[in-house]
Curated annotation (Swiss-Prot):
Residues 66-148 are annotated as: Disordered. HAMAP family: ZipA. This is Cell division protein ZipA. The keyword Cell membrane applies.
Length: 296
C-alpha cells in the first residue's frame, strides 16, 4: 500500500510538533535550574540582622570608601548652655547675624503636613498674622533664647545625621533655604532650632547643628560655607509633645536628604532604617513612662 502525499504531511507534522514540545520541555527544565540558582545566590547575600530594607542598599555604601565626619553626642551643643554662652548673641559684633535672623523669620511658608499621628491643636499653630513686621524682628531672637535656656539638662538625646553624598558637601545657601522651608531658624549657640511656630516662636522642638567641628554655622559667611554633614537632635526631657516633635524632625531630615543628595544616619552612624525610627519612638515612650513613674 503506497503512502500518499497527505499521509507524509501528517507524519512530518507529528514529528515537528513532537520536536517543538520536546524543545519547550527541555528549555523549561533548563530555565528552572537557572532561576533556582539565581534565587539561591541572592538569598545568600542577605544579612542575618534586621534592617535589610531597600534603604541599606545601593548608593549608601559609597560612603564606606572614604572617611565620614566623626560625630559623637558629646560634640552636639548642650541644650542647657551657660548664661555666658547665651550672651554671645547680644554682642554688637553679632548685629549682622541678628539682621539675617530677622530676615529669615520674615520668610512666609506654610506648615509642613508631616506627622502621621494626630497633632495637638496648638502644637504647630502659625504665629498671629496681626504681628507687625517690626515686632517680629525685635521679638524673634528673645523668644528663641528664652525657650532654649529654660530647657532642663537632657537625659537622653535622639540624633539623626544627614551626610552629603557629594564630595563638596552641603553648600551654605542651598542648606539655608532647605532648613528655612522646614521651619528652622538660626538662634542661640549659633545653630538652628525648630520652634512650635514656623516664625520661630514658642518652645524648641528640636535643633540642628553642624556635624563637623566646631559644630556651629556662620551666617555672615554663609555664601562660602559648606559642610559634609549636619545633625538633627531632640533632647529628653524637652518639648511637651516629644513624639510629634520627633516626627517633624524626621520629616525635616528626610527633606534635606532628598533635596540635597544626603544620606540619613542614626546615632551609631548606621543607615537610618524604618526599624531605627520605630526604635527611637519606643525610646520616647519608655522615657515618658519613666518620667510618669517618678512623678508618682
Amino acid at each position: 500500500m503506497e503512502i500518499g502525499l497527505r499521509e507524509w504531511l501528517i507524519v512530518i507534522g507529528i514529528i515537528v510538533i513532537a520536536g517543538i514540545l520536546f524543545d519547550g520541555w527541555r528549555r523549561m527544565r533548563g530555565g528552572k535550574g537557572k532561576l533556582k540558582f539565581r534565587l539561591d545566590r541572592s538569598y545568600s547575600n542577605v544579612p542575618d540582622e534586621e534592617g535589610g530594607s531597600a534603604e541599606v542598599l545601593g548608593p549608601s555604601r559609597v560612603l564606606d570608601t572614604h572617611k565620614e565626619p566623626e560625630l559623637d553626642e558629646s560634640d552636639l551643643p548642650s541644650l542647657s548652655a551657660s548664661a555666658r554662652d547665651r550672651e554671645r548673641e547680644h554682642k554688637p559684633a553679632k548685629a549682622s547675624k541678628r539682621g539675617k535672623r530677622a530676615a529669615a523669620a520674615d520668610v512666609q511658608q506654610g506648615d509642613l503636613n508631616l506627622s502621621a499621628e494626630p497633632r495637638e491643636p496648638d502644637l504647630f499653630a502659625d504665629s498671629d498674622d496681626d504681628f507687625a513686621a517690626d515686632n517680629t524682628r525685635s521679638n524673634a531672637a528673645p523668644a528663641a533664647s528664652s525657650s532654649v535656656k529654660d530647657l532642663p539638662p537632657a537625659e537622653e538625646v535622639l540624633v539623626i545625621s544627614v551626610i552629603s553624598r557629594d564630595e563638596g558637601g552641603f553648600k551654605g545657601p542651598a542648606l539655608l533655604q532647605n532648613i528655612l522651608e522646614s521651619g528652622l531658624r538660626f538662634g542661640e549657640m549659633d545653630i538652628f532650632h525648630r520652634h512650635e511656630s514656623m516664625a520661630g516662636h514658642g518652645e524648641v522642638l528640636f535643633s540642628m547643628a553642624n556635624a563637623v567641628k566646631p559644630g556651629v554655622f556662620d551666617l555672615d559667611d554663609i555664601d562660602h560655607f559648606s559642610t559634609r554633614a549636619v545633625s538633627f537632635f531632640l533632647g529628653l526631657p524637652g518639648p511637651r509633645h516629644p513624639k510629634q516633635a520627633f516626627d517633624v524632625m524626621v520629616a525635616a531630615a528626610r527633606k534635606l536628604a532628598h533635596e540635597l543628595n544626603g544620606e540619613l544616619k542614626d546615632d551609631q552612624r548606621s543607615v537610618l532604617t524604618a526599624q531605627t525610627i520605630e526604635h527611637y519612638r519606643q525610646r520616647i515612650v519608655e522615657f515618658e513612662r519613666r518620667a510618669l513613674t517618678q512623678k508618682r
